[in-house]
UniProtKB/Swiss-Prot annotation:
Record's comment on post-translational modification: RNA-binding phosphoprotein p12 is phosphorylated on serine residues.
Pfam families assigned: Gag_MA, Gag_p12, Gag_p30, zf-CCHC
Compositionally biased residues, Basic and acidic residues: 449-464, 484-517
GO BP terms in the entry: viral budding via host ESCRT complex
Zn finger (CCHC-type) start-end: 500-517
Gene designation per UniProt: gag
Lipidation (N-myristoyl glycine): 2
Protein name listed in UniProt: Gag polyprotein
Amino acid sequence: MGQTVTTPLSLTLQHWGDVQRIASNQSVDVKKRRWVTFCSAEWPTFNVGWPQDGTFNLGIISQVKSRVFCPGPHGHPDQVPYIVTWEALAYDPPPWVKPFVSPKPPPLPTAPVLPPGPSAQPPSRSALYPALTPSIKSKPPKPQVLPDSGGPLIDLLTEDPPPYGAQPSSSARENNEEEAATTSEVSPPSPMVSRLRGRRDPPAADSTTSQAFPLRMGGDGQLQYWPFSSSDLYNWKNNNPSFSEDPGKLTALIESVLITHQPTWDDCQQLLGTLLTGEEKQRVLLEARKAVRGNDGRPTQLPNEVNAAFPLERPDWGYTTTEGRNHLVLYRQLLLAGLQNAGRSPTNLAKVKGITQGPNESPSAFLERLKEAYRRYTPYDPEDPGQETNVSMSFIWQSAPDIGRKLERLEDLKSKTLGDLVREAEKIFNKRETPEEREERIRREIEEKEERRRAEDEQRERERDRRRHREMSKLLATVVIGQRQDRQGGERRRPQLDKDQCAYCKEKGHWAKDCPKKPRGPRGPRPQTSLLTLGD
């Protein structure tokens, strides 16, 4: 039977769950398909010695990492999570990676290891961490040339050196060596280790475990330089909108980084290359160079003055000198001005008019959004006193309907400032009924409407009943009168006669039997009605 060859790539795929866990600890996310593609197809094309089956060699990983983090269009931001995870596997290898990790190089012959003194402590688990001298004397152990295998492996030869480090003089170097030999206290661990590997042992009490700044004050009072970490840049890029989508938010982020981290010229280029596209970066640099001012305080277009204040090529500014720090401060200020000017969109008043107050938005928050729209879509500054009238009118017309109507009816509206309008709007907003009160009012109005409708229905029913009763009463009265007339109908056909009135001729003075007009003689036979016979 043949045996399967295990490679670093196949090993990571077999332990993919551990790889994802390590990536999560680095605040990144990796996908298996892209992991295989980058390892076997992309990184071998960098010509740094990366094999198609992968490697855990820190030197090669660092070279690939430098190509991935290259600023400008030659960088590969989409590959950052994957090379960071590879680096984490090599720095702090899990048990299944340790057999494949390259052994630590032996010490150079020009740097012999001095045996420890009688009060020396066994070396710490990392070669970069100092050995603290205990107060209790112990038996000196055997000198150890290599650090413990469990410690983090960092190839110092492949780390990028600080770009602005000033070379110390020979006398200063000798003094530093004497101090290092005589003192019992040593400097805290490397800030880069603290930044990139938060899972290390806690450093000394006087060191920091927060994100390291590019320029920070060292223990001897001198500025020390530490570059941005890949995790910082990756998190800033992925946790914020793009510059084209929301320039204000990204400008605020870069402004906070410029103030707190005090980056150098190279750091600024790396920051812009990571957070901005190539076209956005060029626009920002152009606007920043336009903001350069001459000796008279007005914007200048002289190439020598512009290049001196905001160079496009790497300048020779030492951060250890006052002049160099002043140049860096001015450069950051101009860069911030370029970000603000480049973030302004073309004039579009329709965008400003489209900003309306939300149903539950406070007037203050609405005013901030309105001012931001003025800054972004118009060349006007909403804080300018000359633009206060325009902003006030927009605030009134684009407020919520109930607030806008009451603001329009204010007395002496023309003399009201924007602050007065905001205070009045806040009063109106705070007097609004709560959702519970609104529901109660609506319920009460519905009940009152139902009561009115029910009362109206009952009134109409009563009117209908009264009308029907009157009609029935009239009908019954008509029937009763008719029946009474029917009963008295015969008597009316024979009107009553007076005592001396004739019933035959209706004359008075005699009765009917003595009426001279009544025929006398026998009555004739009644005429017989002849019936037709069959013979007829």
